[in-house]
Amino acid sequence: MEKSSIYGLTWTNLTEWLEAHGQKKFRATQVWDWLYRKRVKTFEEMSNVPKETIELLTANFVMNTLEEQVVQESTDGTTKYLFKLSDGNLIETVMMKQEYGLSVCVTTQVGCNIGCTFCASGLLKKSRDLTAGEIVEQIMNVQHYLDGRNLEERVSHVVVMGIGEPFDNYDNVMDFLRVINHDKGLAIGARHITVSTSGLAPRIIDFANEDFQVNLAISLHAPNNELRTSIMRINKTYSIEKLMEAIHYYVNKTNRRITFEYIMLKGVNDHKKEALELAALLGEHRHLAYVNLIPYNPVDEHIDYERSTKEDVLAFYDTLKKNGINCVIRREHGTDIDAACGQLRSKQIKRVGVRERMKQKQAAAEE
């Protein structure tokens, strides 16, 4: 039997599992204290947990399914991690130092099928969803990295914006949120957590009905169907009209602000025309709409795209502001490392592929 990650169990899951296996309910409190407060790396270190319980946990669960492969540190404090999963797949995680604390961007899938033409993540198609445990472990590995350097710093914010579409892995992402938000877990405040979606309208409605105060971000990137479909394949399934219907439901249900992410592509979506269209699109909910203008990180494989000029970004920003839309230009992180989402993973897979082809050629030559 393949063991699963202990980090994938919510508080309710762990409590019920322990009781079903003849253990006292309060053991869950002890185990979570060791996992998330003391942050031990083995079950054997849980000194106040009975040997019987330790043996039971060891027989059924593991604590470390991610293996650190590459760590890139930027001069601005951003750190990018490449992890290998137990099946050999690679994923990325990013830690960013902000004025308000330490923020970690997590991956939710191995690859991505959404098909955004400007994104490095979509170059390698989705092979599987991550488990809740694999998502939680990204946070824990970053925290262990900090602990190991005797840095008295704690992950305080989480953005679910890494490789993959979070709402295409909905159940595992929800369990992940329940673990990191729980007061006996990592206790990261709901309002310090943001989940981003490319626009899976039915899941936005589901998310509105969850008992969470977690922030929602929409990867919009275009204000009309023709343009959005040309750069985001998901728009063929969920048009802007369907997306806005779901957003209308979310806003009315939660009365919470939504962030709209808008990547600035030179000559594609950065004209005054698009800025005015965007302002009109968000007008009904302008009091709860917040636009995040994102400078494009060029990706080698996407030679058709360039980042908008600073002048065009500022002009776009000014047009939105003049039309009553709250917006900000995102501060860039890790510009001196593989900053674009999916870029480090893509490069590593290429390197491995080249090495394997060289080995095959060498073996063939020796035969």
From Swiss-Prot:
Compartments it resides in: Cytoplasm
> Major location, coarse class?
cytoplasm
**Which cofactor(s) does the record list?**
[4Fe-4S] cluster
Q: Name one GO molecular function term.
A: 4 iron, 4 sulfur cluster binding
Q: Where does [4Fe-4S] cluster bind?
A: C112, C116, C119
Keywords linked to the UniProt accession: 4Fe-4S, Cytoplasm, Disulfide bond, Iron, Iron-sulfur, Metal-binding, Methyltransferase, rRNA processing, S-adenosyl-L-methionine, Transferase, tRNA processing
The record's annotation in InterPro entries points to:
Aldolase_TIM, Methyltransferase_A, RlmN_N, RNA_MTrfase_RlmN, rRNA_lsu_MTrfase_RlmN/Cfr, rSAM
The first-level EC class reads: transferase
Q: Looking at the keywords, is Iron-sulfur present?
A: yes
Task: Tell me which residues this entry annotates as catalytic.
Answer: E92 (proton acceptor), C341 (s-methylcysteine intermediate)
Signal sequence bounds: none
UniProt-annotated binding residues for S-adenosyl-L-methionine: G164, E165, S196, S219, L220, H221, N297
Q: Name one GO cellular component term.
A: cytoplasm
Q: Which GO BP terms sit in this record?
A: rRNA base methylation; tRNA methylation
Instruction: List each copy of the Radical SAM core domain by range.
Output: 98-326
Chemical reaction(s) catalysed: adenosine(2503) in 23S rRNA + 2 reduced [2Fe-2S]-[ferredoxin] + 2 S-adenosyl-L-methionine = 2-methyladenosine(2503) in 23S rRNA + 5'-deoxyadenosine + L-methionine + 2 oxidized [2Fe-2S]-[ferredoxin] + S-adenosyl-L-homocysteine; adenosine(37) in tRNA + 2 reduced [2Fe-2S]-[ferredoxin] + 2 S-adenosyl-L-methionine = 2-methyladenosine(37) in tRNA + 5'-deoxyadenosine + L-methionine + 2 oxidized [2Fe-2S]-[ferredoxin] + S-adenosyl-L-homocysteine
Textual note on the cofactor = Binds 1 [4Fe-4S] cluster. The cluster is coordinated with 3 cysteines and an exchangeable S-adenosyl-L-methionine.
Q: What else is known?
A: Reaction proceeds by a ping-pong mechanism involving intermediate methylation of a conserved cysteine residue.
Q: What is this protein's function?
A: Specifically methylates position 2 of adenine 2503 in 23S rRNA and position 2 of adenine 37 in tRNAs.
The family this protein is said to belong to: Belongs to the radical SAM superfamily. RlmN family.
Query: Which HAMAP family is this protein grouped with?
Result: RNA_methyltr_RlmN
> What is the recorded name of this protein?
Probable dual-specificity RNA methyltransferase RlmN
What high-level taxonomic lineage is stated for the organism? Answer: Bacteria, Bacillati, Bacillota, Bacilli, Bacillales
